[in-house]
């Protein structure tokens, strides 16, 4: 098996499986050491999966049109960039940005699972998709995952802002001299 394929599989499997636990509040709160150690491994795995996916898209003669090639280059690059920005954020101790960028990177990495679901639904409802429909379904899957991730990110950040506003209103105002 070619090295990029091996790297893609060995990176994607732990990234997709172990990555889910990184978002579980109980693991982060009760096992912060595990979260940090697993996070370091998963950054490497995610980058390996993303970069090898980009390499295969660029250099392997895959059955794809320019549309799917564009989707793969766009979302693969976005995954690598999201993971890199998540790493930079945590190194700066910006936990909120770290969480948001890693969630985006993870959502893109989970695209294959959503692609299987959207493809299966299409087959069950309509029939086997043609090449163009198949490629649009693949792109739609990455978009679906990112929309869900953005909804979660914004929902959590808006809850935090509401709590800050309530806390600010509850504090007695001090005179400034």
Question: What does each model-identified segment do?
Answer:
Residues 1-177:
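Alpha-helical membrane insertion/targeting regions
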